């Protein structure tokens, strides 16, 4: 149990990448926690936004791999925000503080929904250059909990955790997926009542994405085809919303493929970011491009051979 937490990779990550805490709101209790790794000269990095149960370090495998290839990667943990507008305003202030004009966003589940809402919120003065949406959704009504969204703040921590755990896989899973679930349960335990209540509120508050505002943004939709908290209908809705999106399909990986299928996820991220190489919106150090592209080509070949 808890293999990931004691793994050499995770310990190396914790000992080499510092966790930063930043306040951008008037309210000092609203603290953004983040890992910022890779070359600082990159002005359009890839930013990871976690699911309800996640902390910034759930993306440690992406940070280690992608920074090794020369990418600048930032993984975030949200402050306590109670509505989407407040989140978007806070995130915009954070990007201003970090002096980042435009960014690429990778959002997992709730993180993906918030990434879309932020792209929508800033559509008149765009801050999002591209989106990778992993196991994500475009309309909170799919959870059938919009009526309870206003009462999460009242619930004790154990009840909130029970709600979140209800979406974790309960059937048989392979050892890597079991390790990923253990790690996410551990991360969930580290969240306080207000953190959890606010995230569940954002996840279930009645809201949907307005696609016409973000239709010009390049999108990759990353989906897993085994057990995940998302229904087939929710996935189909995403495909309809983004008809021109690239699709990255993983046969297995459950709710947390970035932990248990990290090599595949990392490769799909690299394939997505490849289209921006050589532009001012590249997330990679120009001196690293040729070696990285060769590796991506090899990996893509492996994926297409597997699919045949």
Swiss-Prot record:
MF (Gene Ontology): CD4 receptor binding
Family: Belongs to the AB hydrolase superfamily.
Residue numbers bearing the Phosphoserine modification: 304
One cellular component term from this protein's GO annotations in UniProt: cytosol
Self-association and partners: Interacts with CD4.
Organism for this UniProt entry: Bos taurus
Chain's role: May play a role as a negative regulatory factor in CD4-dependent T-cell activation.
Residue span, AB hydrolase-1 domain: 87-159
Keyword list, A-Z: Cytoplasm, Phosphoprotein
PANTHER family per record: ACID CLUSTER PROTEIN 33 (PTHR15913), MASPARDIN (PTHR15913:SF0)
Protein name (database record): Maspardin
Localisation: Cytoplasm
